[in-house]
């Protein structure tokens, strides 16, 4: 069996170089034309077939040809409308845009993982999808990839990768259940009963109920959920 640590060290400069290249060329959500094209170039070099999904999403497939689990790795690829002030050699070349949330690293990480796993495809079983998500910062892209993977038969496990400044280089953190913030919408309807201002006892204010709900949710966030 191959030594994953040795391979990670072998391709360390490859991943760093890609990350810096992506950092120099940030693109906003759903506009990741150069980024997705660059990702496809790397997948072509590796001989990994891929599909463009709903625009600038890219999903590559490493198929070992042997029965086994199906795994997906996902990294997002969009940047933010933020001016970069850092004076580094790989500073953003597009004024007003930068990879301020690490998506340059995520794209490079998934490509690095793809290269290692593809190198050892003959030693593995099952299928591995490498997914590059557009538009994460505005809440798009993921659903299209999920639906595409369902059409292909689904996956047994999916790993959404994200860097963490509190972890040393070379370390990963895994946790059961949610570990980072998500982008979703939900709605609560509180129904009250109107009345005259002089007889609040005959009314039922939805505002009082909503404030109680809000305070309970805020308390849960502060005391029950690890930041």
PLM regions and their residue ranges:
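Acidic/His- and Gly-rich active-site-bordering loop/insert found
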Residues: 2-99, 108, 115-124
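Residue-level detector of alpha-helical segments with a strong bias toward transmembrane helices
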Residues: 112-113, 202
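Histidine/acidic-residue-rich, glycine-tolerant segments that coordinate divalent metal ions
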Residues: 80, 88-98, 105, 122-227
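A ubiquitous structural signal for well-ordered alpha-helices
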Residues: 18, 113, 213-216
